[in-house]
UniProtKB/Swiss-Prot annotation:
Function: This protein binds specifically to 23S rRNA.
Membrane-traversing stretches: none
Subcellular location: Plastid, Chloroplast
Source species, domain of life: Eukaryota
A Gene Ontology BP annotation from the UniProt entry: translation
A GO MF term: structural constituent of ribosome
HAMAP family per UniProt: Ribosomal_uL22_B (MF_01331_B)
Keywords noted in UniProt: Chloroplast, Plastid, Ribonucleoprotein, Ribosomal protein, RNA-binding, rRNA-binding
This protein's name: Large ribosomal subunit protein uL22c
Sequence similarity: Belongs to the universal ribosomal protein uL22 family.
Gene: rpl22
GO cellular component, one term: chloroplast
UniProt cross-references to NCBIfam families, sorted A to Z: rplV_bact (TIGR01044)
Length: 149
């Protein structure tokens, strides 16, 4: 008779290799000026976090002009409020800090969950059905890149 050895099973989880490291190499961190950045946040956007995240993953670690071009051509509904947010952040950078739009670079683009608006829809036989409208907060950080010599 053979005996089996009981061993604790630990599943191996392969880590996904993120493409962000490649994109982050486009502009070395020593060329990003540490305190030369502009924050812009928009709160309570009526959109799912996952839909916004899909668009923000495409624009992170890109220059401003490239970002505007990508957002204009994206077929997602989530790209319009994000485009307005990026425009506003760039306008703040040029108006208040006298930055050049050609040197602006998106270093941080994140989305977080906000409140959920709950409504009830009338159904058959006097019953009601809950509708949950999710909202999100989006934060964009534009950093200025100094010119290489």
């Amino acid at each position: 008779m053979t005996s089996f050895k009981l061993v604790k099973y630990i599943p191996r989880i392969k880590k996904k290799k993120s493409g962000l490291r490649k994109l982050a190499r486009k502009v070395p961190t020593d060329r990003l000026l540490k305190f030369e950045r502009v924050f812009k946040a928009q709160k309570r956007i009526p959109m799912s976090v996952f839909k916004a995240q899909r668009v923000l993953d495409e624009i992170r670690w890109r220059y401003y002009e490239e970002t505007v071009m990508i957002l204009n051509l994206m077929p997602y509904r989530a790209s319009y409020p994000i485009l307005k947010l990026v425009y506003s952040a760039a306008a703040n950078a040029t108006h208040y800090r006298d930055f050049d739009k050609a040197n602006l670079f998106i270093t941080k683009a994140e989305v977080s969950r906000s409140t959920i608006m709950k409504k009830f829809r009338p159904r058959a036989r006097g019953r009601s059905f809950p509708i949950k409208k999710s909202m999100c907060h989006i934060t964009i950080v534009l950093n200025i890149v100094k010119k290489s010599k």
